[in-house]
Amino acid sequence: MFEKEISFIKSLFNKENIALHEPCFIGNEKKYLLECIDSGFVSSVGEFVTRFEEALKEKTKARFVIATNTGTAALHIALLANGIDENCEVITQSISFVATANAIAYTGAKPVFLDIDENTLSLSPKALEHFLENQTYQKDNLSYNKTTHKPIKACVIMHTFGLSAHIKAIKELCEKCHILLIEDAAEALGSTYENKALGTFGKCGILSFNGNKIITGGCGGAILSDDENLAKLARHLSTTAKIPHPYEYDHDRIAYNYRLCNINAAILFAGLENLELFLENKRELAKIYKDFFKNHDKCKFIDEKSNEKSNFWLNTLLFKNENLRNIFLEECLKNNIFVRPVWKSLPSLKAFQNCQSNELINTKKLEKRLINLPSSVRIANKKE
């Protein structure tokens, strides 16, 4: 049924096995790795961690950047630094990678799952507005859940597949109800809305540099913020809360060993030097996909919206029904083309089935019809 589509995808990558999103190392990775090894500083202290943080500040225009060993760790610390704990709740979207909900759960807080927007695949502003108007009340400059009577202190949105959420509308709703906005921009490095980097609209944002991201160090994450006090606390919590001293080991609270290692930072710093090239390449691939699937009779390409510039981390198709999606998925896999369905909705997972959620109309309508296409940067690694 999808012979033409499979042939087209094969022509784009010209490989026997086509990955969903493989790493691309074409710059100074080996050079910086050797420098890192020769320095003797390969763990959580070293020149490349600082250089990477400074370069990421320049790319995102965030005042402060704290590098961590994963995006999940970054989100966990961001929540803790904003005072999220077992005594409160956090709004988030129904479809996201499980790490979004896990990080909330690590703090002891309960996630409240709201529906996604059918165009952005991120949190629906309409669902958020309906929930805030009908299921919360205000007291002492806090929003409380009418069902549990617990304060809702934060809203975590995820910019799905590098596409921007309706970030301005969501931010306005959060500010109106005294709810902190935290952006899970794990998939959105290089994406912007109105020329402002995703991850820099809320109180803080996070990025991920896992092996399948647009740049990678094998692992890695980062917290972005313009709030100096929050940034200081986040850095403190991510480095075991060690009190600075020439030789004593003293720690003022329970904290975490989440600091990015210098050896990973060396690879990331090299990748960041090529970010603009990668973004240009990925946007070119997205246009090719968009043109091919335009007016397709079985699916449509999920495109960026006005005022948005996406990194198109994972190009995405929405099929007319689940059966068509499954046929496409199976035919691609038989031809060694790795495509994937979207994650199962978070409220459907065993760990979160007892958490509150609203009527997830779009979630139920979309989750079994979406497919991510191969989206690697199509630049050959340099030959030695």
Question: Where in the sequence are the language-model features?
Answer:
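Active-site phosphate-binding strand-loop segment of PLP-dependent enzymes
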Residues: 119-217, 223-224, 229
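PLP-dependent aminotransferase class I/II
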Residues: 8, 50-54, 62-63, 126, ...
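Conserved PLP-anchoring active-site segment centered on the Schiff-base-forming lysine
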Residues: 78-132, 145, 156, 331
